[in-house]
Amino acid sequence: MIIVHGLLSLSLKGYKKWIHWLNEQGWNGVLMHLPYHFQRKSPSLLFSARCVQPNLVHTMETLRQSVMDLYTFTRGLRRVGSPLIAGWGISYGAWTISQLCSFDDTLHKLILVEPLLHVHYVIWQSPAGKEIRKKLTRLGITPSETYPHLRLACPSLSKPKLDGQDILIVGGLYDKISPPWILKEIKEKWKVDHLFFFPVGHLNNTLTSKSFKLALECWKDDFSLSHD
């Protein structure tokens, strides 16, 4: 299981806990460190917001680097003989791993927790994009000008190379960054079998445990210690 963290993640503690849980289910787990996070940021910074900023070219280049890192790693796992490779991503991490799945079929299962799938909405309408759109507007850049350039960077405009039965999406009913209506539209477009909502907002820690437990229910055979 490849775990892809969210934007501005500060601690590895919670992720290590869930990797240990995966080990108990018979899975290996690894946490990908995205650009400008953990060992990939300046030691003088507590965290870095450089992944997403008003400089949209830089934002897209950072996303591309994240996706290529994932691509290289998953291909490496396949070459050494991993029989089943799954991906779990939350928020920005879910955006990244969804982009990988739009052109690569290495992953067999995909778990997305409050994923950022409609990038245009995130930038121009969500609370998270307030400062970005303020600066873009100051530069005279409009939504109609940015939309065409998101074609290769927005999961809502593509489709993963997985069957719908192999995708699990978990969202928050009060999430204003990845709202239910967007996830419901994605469910229809991607023909996703497993979509669940809980009464929480964005980046609620309880959804991590809920997502893994739902995966255990949805794909019981794949998480069985005896399936080998």
Task: Describe each region flagged by the PLM.
Residues 88-97:
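Gly/Ala-rich beta-loop-alpha elbow adjacent to hydrolase catalytic centers
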Residues 99-143, 197:
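Hydrolase active-site cap/lid region
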Residues 122-188:
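The feature captures the conserved acid-bearing segment of alpha/beta-hydrolase catalytic domains
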